[in-house]
């Protein structure tokens, strides 16, 4: 019953769009962390975040603020276990497994790798998963083609308006020919967005030069190499916390 009540409240939170509040504030980098706030006789929620990044932090804060507005507040009737994967997909999977073992009432997953890990870990545990900051839930197999829920998971998308970005780049850089895109090869949403850029680039007389990276350790070298080949550069997916 408690999970059903929480699910209803979270539906209201999703409707208000509070989980999509992803901005661009800056934060410092820290080691993998676990912050737990305690509350007596209330809800337990595990929050898994893929990286230390302002926009992802805003998603987490917006999620908690939305719950607070619905009467579920950290330190009163809500216990939050926040863990950060520090851009490591293996760590994201371990975090998800730990939330299932802890029998959290719900898992909030921020960014695609955490969302996929949470869904895979919780699918047989009767623990609902709410995700945010997922650009392409369908490609990530977190939603059906019509946008409906897959299993016990729902959430919000931060899909980019690709064509509008191309229009803006053309207006700002009328002589530009090549756009560089740095993306994470292991993220389905990142790959699908690059494909969309490629499909639309010709319409605005652009050529897309893309470079895939496997880990955050590859970013600096890949970005330095890519910037020498293009007129402007776009950072995608997990690359955003460094580019």
Show the residue positions of the predicted features.
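Extracytoplasmic "Venus flytrap"
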Residues: 44-70, 81-90, 186-190, 240
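Short beta-strand scaffold positions
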Residues: 47, 108-109
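Short, well-structured alpha-helical segments in soluble
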Residues: 87-106, 117-120, 220-232
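Flexible loop/hinge segments that line or gate small-molecule binding clefts
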Residues: 117, 122-162
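Conserved small/polar residues in nucleotide/adenosyl-binding loops
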Residues: 237-243
């Amino acid at each position: 019953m408690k999970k059903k009540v929480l699910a209803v409240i979270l539906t209201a939170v999703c409707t208000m769009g509070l989980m999509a509040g992803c901005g661009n504030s800056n934060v410092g980098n820290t080691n993998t962390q676990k912050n737990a706030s305690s509350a007596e006789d209330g809800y337990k929620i595990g929050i898994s975040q893929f990286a230390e990044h302002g926009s992802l932090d805003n998603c987490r804060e917006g999620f908690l603020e939305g719950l607070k507005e619905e009467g579920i507040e950290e330190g009163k009737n809500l216990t939050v276990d926040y863990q950060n994967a520090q851009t490591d997909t293996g760590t994201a999977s371990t975090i998800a497994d730990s939330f299932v073992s802890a029998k959290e009432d719900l898992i909030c997953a921020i960014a695609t790798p955490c969302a996929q890990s949470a869904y895979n870990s919780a699918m047989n545990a009767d623990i609902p998963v709410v995700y945010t900051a997922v650009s392409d839930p369908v490609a990530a197999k977190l939603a059906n083609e019509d946008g409906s829920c897959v299993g016990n998971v729902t959430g919000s998308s931060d899909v980019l308006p690709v064509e509008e970005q191309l229009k803006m780049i053309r207006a700002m850089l009328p002589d530009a020919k090549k756009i560089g895109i740095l993306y994470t090869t292991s993220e389905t949403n990142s790959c699908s967005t690059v494909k969309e850029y490629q499909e639309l680039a010709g319409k605005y007389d652009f050529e897309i030069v893309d470079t895939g990276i496997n880990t955050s350790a590859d970013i600096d070298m890949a970005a330095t190499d890519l910037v020498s080949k293009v007129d402007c550069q776009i950072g995608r997916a997990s690359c955003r916390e460094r580019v």
